[in-house]
Amino acid sequence: MKNVVIAAGYATRLGELTKNFPKPLLKIGENTILGRMLDDIDRIPEIDEHIIITNHKFAPIFEEWVHANTLIKEHESNESNEYSCHSSYSCSKYTKPITVVDDGTETNETRLGAVCDLLFAMEQLQVDDDLLVVAADNLLFFSFQEFVDFAKEKQTSCIMCHEQPSIEKLQRTGVVEVDEQMRVLGMEEKPQVPKSHWAVPPFYI
């Protein structure tokens, strides 16, 4: 199973703080947001590689962050597409290799979006494996191991959800309808009239 980290946004709402620096690499205490996430996911036995998909503007910063924990740079590819490039590293801090993929975009207006970035990374690396897909800019206080175990038990694609009583918060996130067996019946993004209280964070298998 590959861990695909979606980190290609431009975090424009944070203003100067992320004008020239990616939000996932902001420090919270002694660690970055992304670092805290990988610290957990790297311990999951089923995960054999981390793939970070980012944009052309921030790719060098992610490369530098990965390189800070690097023992050996294993592979670099830059094929016919000017922006179709990726690098893989074996890291001293993490037991699984980290691959950084540059999606070629340079502005918020030209960004691909999460789904297209995911497809881009899969095509560039020719991935044919199960995926844990996570958004890189979330501060977490739980382990993904239980989520992976749940997906293995159910033998199907899974999304993470949690009960959210606040209508205002539901209007700012994805919301799913589920049946009694927690099978997804429908999903809406930022609905003005939520059909359930099940909020969906950006974590998928």
For each feature predicted by the language model, list its residue ranges.
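Conserved N-terminal catalytic core of the sugar/cofactor nucleotidyltransferase
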Residues: 2-5, 13, 27, 31-135, ...
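Short, flexible coil/turn micro-motifs enriched in small/turn-prone residues
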Residues: 4-6, 108, 169, 196-197
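Conserved phosphate-binding and hydrolysis motifs of nucleotide-dependent enzymes
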Residues: 9
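Conserved beta-strand positions that form and line the central face of beta-propeller blades
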Residues: 13, 24, 186
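Short, flexible helix/strand-to-coil boundary loops that buttress conserved ligand/catalytic motifs
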Residues: 18, 45, 66, 188-191
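Short alpha-helical oligomerization interface
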Residues: 19-23
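Conserved beta-strand scaffold positions in the cores of enzyme catalytic domains, especially
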Residues: 25, 100, 157-159
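Conserved core of the sugar-phosphate nucleotidyltransferase
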Residues: 141-205
